[in-house]
Curated annotation (Swiss-Prot):
It is found in: Cytoplasm. Its main location: cytoplasm. ATP binds at residues 134-189. InterPro entries: ATP-grasp, ATP_grasp_subdomain_1, D-Ala_lig_Van_CS, D_ala_D_ala, Dala_Dala_lig_C, Dala_Dala_lig_N, PreATP-grasp_dom_sf. It catalyses: 2 D-alanine + ATP = D-alanyl-D-alanine + ADP + phosphate + H(+). Cell wall formation. This is D-alanine--D-alanine ligase.
Amino acid sequence: MTQLNTQFGKVAVLLGGNSAEREVSLRSGQAVLNALQNHGINAIAFDPKERPLWELNELAIDRVFIALHGRGGEDGTVQGALEFMNLPYTGSNVLGSALAMDKVRCKHLFKSAGLSTAPYTVVDAKKGFDAAAIMQQFKKVMVKPSHEGSSIGMAQASTPQELEDALSNAFKFDSQVLVEQWISGREFTITVLGDEVLPVIEMTTPNGFYDYQAKYQATTTQYHCPADLSPADTEHLQAMALDAFDLVGASGWGRVDAMQDQQGNFYLLEVNTVPGMTEKSLVPMAAKAHGASFEQLVVRILEQTL
């Protein structure tokens, strides 16, 4: 029988929620819950879709592990509620969460700070747009709803018609959409844990890009950890990731995604403040390459609330 670990008190794992990433969050949260309980921590699952947050007080919760992805859980909303309730929680604060979740604001920040990021434009559902002019400027683009994760609502476009179709779909998720120059090359992700940067992971997929299907369903997606990069490139990419993480005000733990074009230049994509923690997730993979088990990773994240 596992000895009870009392230093954390009673912990609620927030999972599920109302976002388009609910199913992924349920899997992440269950994995986190199992790890905490295996470590002897008094932890329970709490789904904000099923019950109001104020019940956390009734349950005498001491701290919260946030495993919510997307809107309502990763955008500063639940963080603000927990701040109001004086409950310590994992990950970034209200501002860091809100900024990182907003792809458009992140791009503006990266650009203004001189960090390398792909050329882009922003399309608003309430305003008109010229698909032909955008495609003439960029040739090939990636379309991303500003506030979604797990590649939800994302699509490539190489013609004005494809762009119109991609925007029409993206507008179902968000009124502001990021249209980004397509970078053809290698895709990487870098985990930040406390003040450490973990080994870089490279993802390869026949899907064209690392989309929802490649992330959670495909058996053809391959992961290389640590990535096959020179020591200089690895150091540069890790430093760039840490700069981006700090710039948006993220803290505690998270993941930064980046690309390398065929000329060897690196470009920042986005910062994730509550990355996936499923069996296929990248943060546990990086932690394992760093010598930490999944349980050790989860406990280390929770320790940041003490």
